[in-house]
Amino acid sequence: MSDISDANKLKHRFRGYFPVVIDVETAGFNSQTDALLEIAVTLLKMDDEGLLGIDKTLHFNIEPFEGANLEPEALAFNGIDPTNPLRGAVSEKEAFLEIFKAVKKAQKASDCHRSIIVAHNAAFDHGFVSKAIERCDLKRSPFHPFATFDTATLAGLAIGHTVLAKACIMAGIPFDNKEAHSALYDTERTAELFCYIVNRWKHLGGWPLLAAGESEDTDGEE
């Protein structure tokens, strides 16, 4: 029983990694030249039964960094006006200092040793996050430098669809296309999808795995 209870702790679920769901809205596809305009970060928690759920979400509108490229097509797609004062935008550095603080606190509370980005088509979000951290010359990032959990891949395996909206609907998660392409909305739907996949795998008997000690005993008996 103690082995099962221990396996239900978040620190043991992903090899000591604390999953942090992130979505960004940008002014293009090039993380080196195009502006990061919006970011939302959803922190997760695990209950005593080992089920993953949403804890809280942070959200920031971001000021384009100096010299940033703003692709008109990208702005038309996400509907963001970077010059609108009502956005209440903050600098990349201010946003990431707050994100680091919240992530490290949650990571420590879960007794995890590092955080790992969860995102839909994660290479895109990870690239923009990593470049912004580099631009701000921030040290001791809580995030793994290259490993991620990509919900597009996970959804393709678990649900049979890779598009966020359709994967959510197939998983029974409401999705409003009118709200899509807002970092806040997309992050929370991505978090719900990730939790659904992880929890479904558990319900199907995929976790926890047979304890190493039990496996060794079985091998010895054979």
UniProtKB/Swiss-Prot annotation:
Cellular component GO terms held in the UniProt record: cytosol
SMART domains given in the database record: EXOIII (SM00479)
Binding site for Mg(2+) 1: 23
Site entry (Important for substrate binding and specificity), positions: 29, 77, 124, 146
Alphabetical list of PANTHER family matching this protein: DNA POLYMERASE III SUBUNIT EPSILON, RIBONUCLEASE T
HAMAP family: RNase_T
Protein name: Ribonuclease T
Name of the coding gene: rnt
